[in-house]
Amino acid sequence: VKTSVKTSVKDSITMTIQLNETHNPELRSWVASANQPDSDFPIQNLPFGVFRRHGSHQAFRIGVAIGDQILDLAAAHAIHAFAGYTELQGGHFTTAINAPYLNALMALGTPVWSALRLALSRVLRADAKHLAALQNCLLPQSAAEYALPAQIGDYTDFYTSLHHATAVGKLFRPDNPLLPNYKWVPIGYHGRASSIGVSGQQFRRPVAQTKPPTAETPVFGPAKRMDYELEIGIFIGQGNAPGDVISMDQAEAHVFGLCLLNDWSARDVQAWEYQPLGPFLAKNFATTISPWVVTLEALAPYRQAWQRNAADPQPLPYLDAPDLRDSGAFDIQLEVLLQTEKMRADGAAPQRLSTSNFRDSYWTVAQLVTHHTVNGCNLNPGDLLGSGTQSGPAPEEAGSLLELTEGGKKSIALSNGEQRLFLEDGDTVILRGWTQKQGLPRIGFGEVTGTLLPARS
């Protein structure tokens, strides 16, 4: 993966990431669990999150996942674990590393993120010095509770899966499933940031207007067609000033990292309200994200060339770039599992419903960032972009129940004898994501879980 770094008069940094010593697949950590081949968090990953000891009621702290542990960054900084790195000195870094959210660290930009990753890699390696002091900076993940990684000021959800858009379009417009703008412009809408929660979120079945097919007028009550959406979340790092455009060659330098995202949806509410402005109450009640943010630098060895079908319109010039063609896609395997209330009561494991891969996305991370700002819209550190439901080309790769059940016509038989068309009260949905390549370690995102509770009476 190529790297170019330059600074303009507006202090924007253009950067794609070079492989470096932190990507060495031979690296091992003194945290033994990080060396297990099935670990989501080997030393080559080092994702960021916000945590505290479960039940402590203390302030949240910034941490990095390593194996089944969390390294407390403020504690590590206090014992001078990051001494000797110019980018990691001074008041701005100290303030950022001691904050209860990642926003200030996100705002410091790629030179600081990369230097911090290098410093972390070196102090966590098997041959690192001062192990006794660093061991006191660890907390088992099993003893932690999490908050949102950042204070999310704005949330925009996109619609980047051609396969999802086509499948859903066929349900409502069989003769014209894909609207004419889809292959030209990344479709997005502004979502609700206040109801985004971290993994483990529980929320009540929303109540709203719907219009059943046989009814002459709408009715008010609990939504009946509850669904999940399998998505990738994109956290913005450094923002841009109002009026400035983030070009394609700058876009990924403004991305702090990726997470998993479940965009819960009430399909019957959505069907009634979405015209002409799109979903509102159908989606604003809850969105759940994973606690760990995986940096683009960690994902660098797992990039792929991005291709657009020759028969399709090619991106307009502002959405195209040589680096996009060379390595614009991310090979991230995604998975959805369901655990019903009965499964939990019986001690049964969750059942996998589908898998897909982010590499099949029609639009890339860089294109979303550039398109979002091309009219001068400013992004801020901690802003969140959703990829939209990630479905693959095969029916079993659908990222929502709406697709898997063909709009509620085809029931899913679960292994314990239960059936599902849409989610029922007590259902827990689990999303997982990881990337893996021959000769390289597994880089995981952990998981994001959420549980649907009954509507308020």
Where would I find each of the regions flagged by the language model?
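Conserved phosphate/anionic-ligand binding catalytic regions in large, soluble enzymes, centered on
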Residues: 154-161, 378, 383-387
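Active-site microenvironments in enzyme catalytic cores
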Residues: 21-53, 65, 72-355, 362-366
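Active-site pocket scaffolds in enzymes
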Residues: 362-371, 381, 385-434, 441-451
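Compositionally biased, intrinsically disordered low-complexity segments enriched
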Residues: 1-13
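Residue-level marker of beta-strand positions
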Residues: 62, 69-70, 231, 384, ...
